[in-house]
């Protein structure tokens, strides 16, 4: 049976994961139904503030859900050969208005972040 162990990541390690990965899983709450979508993102660190920039079409379930509930969670993985680093981000999302037919920028302001490095041993 495989054995799983992990160690907590510090802030610098978590930021390295966010810089090294390019895909996040964005979790939203659509009423009583969870809704998760993969999204590309861009990291911005401004002083002590961490922001994640996402781009989305202006119409659709994702933007409609964000307009009703701005609290989000993102899960970002950075796999390696012997381990996998994972960062969970909790925050609030804001979206701008777009011109018709244009993409909307969604900015997630990070309120809480945690990270782990997972090691799996096959026994």
Each model region followed by its residue ranges:
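Short beta-strand segments
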Residues: 21-57
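Extreme N-terminal tail/first-helix region
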Residues: 1-19
């Amino acid at each position: 049976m495989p054995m799983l162990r992990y160690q907590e990541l510090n802030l610098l390690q978590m930021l390295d994961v966010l810089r090294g990965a390019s895909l996040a899983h964005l979790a939203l709450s659509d009423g009583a139904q969870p809704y998760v979508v993969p999204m590309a993102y861009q990291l911005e660190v401004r002083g002590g503030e961490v922001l994640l920039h996402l781009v989305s079409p202006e119409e659709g379930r994702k933007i409609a859900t964000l307009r009703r509930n701005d609290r989000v969670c993102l899960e970002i993985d950075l796999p390696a050969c012997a381990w996998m680093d994972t960062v969970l981000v909790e925050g609030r999302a804001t979206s701008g208005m777009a011109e018709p037919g244009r993409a909307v920028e969604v900015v997630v302001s990070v309120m809480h972040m945690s990270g782990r490095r997972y090691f799996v041993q096959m026994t």
